[in-house]
Structures are given as C-alpha cells and as structure tokens.
UniProtKB/Swiss-Prot annotation:
SUPFAM superfamilies: Ribosomal proteins S24e, L23 and L15e (SSF54189). One of its GO terms (molecular function) is rRNA binding. This is Large ribosomal subunit protein uL23. The keyword RNA-binding applies. One of the early assembly proteins it binds 23S rRNA. One of the proteins that surrounds the polypeptide exit tunnel on the outside of the ribosome. Forms the main docking site for trigger factor binding to the ribosome. The gene is rplW. Keywords: Ribonucleoprotein, Ribosomal protein, RNA-binding, rRNA-binding. Belongs to the universal ribosomal protein uL23 family. InterPro entries: Nucleotide-bd_a/b_plait_sf, Ribosomal_uL23-like, Ribosomal_uL23/eL15/eS24_sf. The lineage of its organism: Bacteria, Pseudomonadati, Pseudomonadota, Betaproteobacteria, Rhodocyclales. GO terms for cellular component: ribonucleoprotein complex; ribosome. Disulfide bonds: none annotated. HAMAP family: Ribosomal_uL23_B. It comes from Aromatoleum aromaticum (strain DSM 19018 / LMG 30748 / EbN1) (Azoarcus sp. (strain EbN1)).
C-alpha cells in the first residue's frame, strides 16, 4: 500500500463518474473515471483503486472541475469545486460496476 493508511484510502474515492465522456473513455482507452476527494493525490488514488477493486493501475490523471454558478430564485449561488480522476488500467484488467446488481 506504499505508506498510506487503509482508513485514508477508503475516503479517497467518492463515486464512479458515469457520463457520456466517461463511457467513451472507458470503451476506447481502458480507463475508469472517479469523483475523488479534493485533497486526493495521484499515488493515493492509485493505491485506493488497487486496494478496493483488486486491479492493477497503469496511470492516473487528475482534473480539477470548477463548480457552476447557479441561480436559486433571485439569489445566485455556486456549486463546490471537485476533483475527477481518470484511472488507466493495465491490459486485461477491468472494473465492472454493474456486477453488484
């Protein structure tokens, strides 16, 4: 686990990101997209995916997504910024989210 506590790794991955782009990337490049904690680093994301899903990770790319400005009646508000991780799996590895159903 390369020095990360198991408790911290359980808090790094928040949810899989299911969208048109995520599905396209998964089919084309053997990548999986996750919504991760805003304090997460690439090594933490790699260790968390390997621990939770028992797969081998080739690389991790992280993108900071800016929150949108939204209106609530007369008031304007802003959604939180969040972080998205593109996890590239080694050949032959696969994460199937539909298997739990």
């Amino acid at each position: 686990m390369s020095g990360f506590s198991q408790e911290r790794l359980m808090q790094v991955l928040l949810a899989p990101q299911i969208s048109e782009k995520a599905t396209y990337v998964a089919d084309k490049n053997e990548q999986v997209v996750f919504k991760v904690a805003s304090t997460a680093t690439k090594p933490e994301v790699k260790a968390a995916v390997e621990l939770l899903f028992k797969v081998e990770v080739k690389s991790v790319q992280i993108a900071n997504v800016k929150g949108k400005v939204k209106r609530f009646g007369k008031m304007t508000g802003r959604r939180k910024d969040w972080k998205k991780a593109f996890v590239c799996l080694k050949p032959g590895q696969e994460i199937n989210f539909a298997a739990g159903e």
